[in-house]
Amino acid sequence: MIEFKPVRLEDRAVIERYTMPSGICNCDLAFANMYCWQAVFHSAWAEIGGFLVIRFQIDGGERIGYMQPVGEGDFGPILPLLREDAHAHGQRLRIIGLTDEGRDTIRRIVPCHFAFESDRALEDYVYNADDLRNLAGRRYQPKRNHINRFTAEYPDYRYEELTPDRFGECMALEREWRKAHEGHTSELCAEQRAMQRAFEHFEELGLIGGCIYVGDRLAAFTYGSAVNDHTFDTHVEKADTEFDGAFTIINKLFAQHLPERFTLINREEDLGLDGLRQAKLSYHPAFLQHKFAAICMHPDEVACKELWMKAFGDDEQFADSFIMRYYSRRRMLTAEAEGRMAAMLHLLPFRTELGRTTYIYGVATDPAFRGRGLASQLMREAMRLIAERGDDAAFLIPTPGKEWLREFYGRFGFAGDVPARFVSADRFDFGTNCSSFK
């Protein structure tokens, strides 16, 4: 098992020896983020075969994830070591924060053994630093107008460097801001603890910050640190909403006061919040830093994916997303032929206006084994299980354009068209169409 060590202040030089020249813009690689959020994610690190590997606890501490290894060359040879470490903790290997290149490396080294997914809500917004410093051109006119209104209304405003004597005021402003967002108490308390840790070790963490004052009153503050040699990451930005335009002006002035070596500014993710997404898009990012997650699939998941791709022709990303989020061997019925998975279907539980409902999803037969009655065999078993559970209804959506499927499913009691949409809480679309139901 790999010897991982908790991230400590004295580890900064070793960790940044890998991250600074990497060119990777992922905010999770900022040493200050690793250290300040350690109470939540239990960040740990190890050097393996010339690479830095960061290990986190994810999903509320239920699972562990490994960041994309950072170093020179191909990290493929250390994947077996990471897999062994994960297995020693009773888990499958999960790699998070993968760049496009990192994903492609894994696909090349171990094809068909990993499923990949990129969550739009977790992608970092990365901007050209000069765009934020200057706000030049027509597309930034609304931002300039906002700043002009602020400076006209508050002519006594001033920008100051964030120094230790101002930390108390910043925490007081953060507490007031938190009162207005009490619906997310646990997340905000964790952020407050991370801020407190940042202020306790501001200089040692290499943090840089700025403040806006109106008279003697703190209107906004922000701080961050380097992700790599040319990318700065804004970790925190808070403002008193009584001062309209405070967020806009501190964004610009802070960018102007950063060292010129920073040509990119990472303003982190939007967490899927519509208002935050629109605000970040309004500054016109140069690009979004993808952060793919990958899981090492079990043999039955590999077989499910292979059959899915053969039968439906969906893109690989869709199949991977389904497997990573919703696949369960307990909810999948299969038929085998010649030593491999030849047919399958999935029984997905939903709550609808009809009550407890099973959605029969992904009914598929390998083209090489069609005409043998395998799908009929699985449908009979599915209907038996649904009846045994006492579900109130069962739905399925026949593949559009294949009218013969209506007659096929009719043999099992499905009839009628009911407009239905099966979308999960995380917005995964299982199908929107007229459904047959029983």
Enumerate the language-model features and the residues they cover:
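Short amphipathic alpha-helix that is part of the acyltransferase structural core
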Residues: 1-27, 136-194, 295-342, 347, ...
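A short helix-loop-beta-strand connector motif used in the catalytic cores of GNAT acetyltransferases and
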Residues: 24-27, 32-51, 200-210, 323-337, ...
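Conserved beta-strand in the GNAT
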Residues: 45, 49-57, 211, 216-226, ...
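A short, internal acetyl-CoA/4′-phosphopantetheine-binding micro-motif in the GNAT/acyltransferase core
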Residues: 66-74, 235-244, 360-371
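Conserved acetyl-CoA-binding loop-helix of GNAT-fold acetyltransferases
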Residues: 74-84, 243-256, 365, 371-384
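Conserved GNAT acetyl-CoA-binding A-motif
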Residues: 89-99, 260-268, 379, 386-399
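Conserved active-site alpha-helix within GNAT-family acetyltransferase domains
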Residues: 103-116, 271-288, 376, 388-392, ...
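Conserved catalytic-core motifs of GNAT/GCN5-like acyltransferases
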Residues: 117-125, 286-297, 397, 410-431
